[in-house]
């Protein structure tokens, strides 16, 4: 009986594919749309921002991934934190993050944004932007190359596709 069910399912699948039907879940379509139309907002703080600009230029062209840089946090769904985050800049980072609409994602770019980097032991440096905002993807390097940033963005796209469509992120920060 079990084999009969699978045979009928396979016959139905073949019949539908021959006629040109597409079967999917709404959550999969929403995840695909969100992953392929990211609108990043730059939060460039140091030298990593130069590599981020290079990734957006013609040689690497982040536009082919559906990414359109937005100047306003209210129009963007991805924040790229690139560079050294100081104690004085941390409240501004949190304020900009709070202004972004749901669902929102954060990519931490470079050693300084990930954990303080070269300035880790300085009194004025936050030891990782994940102490201020929840981070989805970390891109290592000092500074990371444009290829590393694009790889991190592709990993974020995979993560977005894995999440369900109607459930928003409920992460809490201190």
Curated annotation (Swiss-Prot):
- Reactions catalysed according to its record: a quinone + NADH + 5 H(+)(in) = a quinol + NAD(+) + 4 H(+)(out)
In the record, the note on similarity to other proteins reads: Belongs to the complex I 20 kDa subunit family.
Q: What does this protein do?
A: NDH-1 shuttles electrons from NADH, via FMN and iron-sulfur (Fe-S) centers, to quinones in the respiratory chain. Couples the redox reaction to proton translocation (for every two electrons transferred, four hydrogen ions are translocated across the cytoplasmic membrane), and thus conserves the redox energy in a proton gradient.
Q: How is the cofactor bound?
A: Binds 1 [4Fe-4S] cluster.
> Could you tell me which Pfam families the record lists for this protein?
Oxidored_q6
Q: Does the keyword Membrane apply?
A: yes
Predominant cellular place of this UniProt entry's protein: membrane
User: One biological process GO term for this chain?
Assistant: aerobic respiration
The answer to whether UniProt assigns keyword Transport to this entry is yes
The cofactor named in the record is: [4Fe-4S] cluster
Where in the cell does this protein reside? Cell inner membrane
Subunit annotation: NDH-1 is composed of 14 different subunits. Subunits NuoB, C, D, E, F, and G constitute the peripheral sector of the complex.
Know the name of this protein? NADH-quinone oxidoreductase subunit B
Keywords in alphabetical order, please. 4Fe-4S, Cell inner membrane, Cell membrane, Iron, Iron-sulfur, Membrane, Metal-binding, NAD, Quinone, Translocase, Transport, Ubiquinone
Query: Molecular function terms in GO for this entry?
Result: 4 iron, 4 sulfur cluster binding; iron ion binding; NADH dehydrogenase (ubiquinone) activity; NADH:ubiquinone reductase (non-electrogenic) activity; quinone binding
Supply the EC number(s). 7.1.1.-
Q: How does it sit in the membrane?
A: Peripheral membrane protein
Positions bound to [4Fe-4S] cluster: 47-48, 112, 142
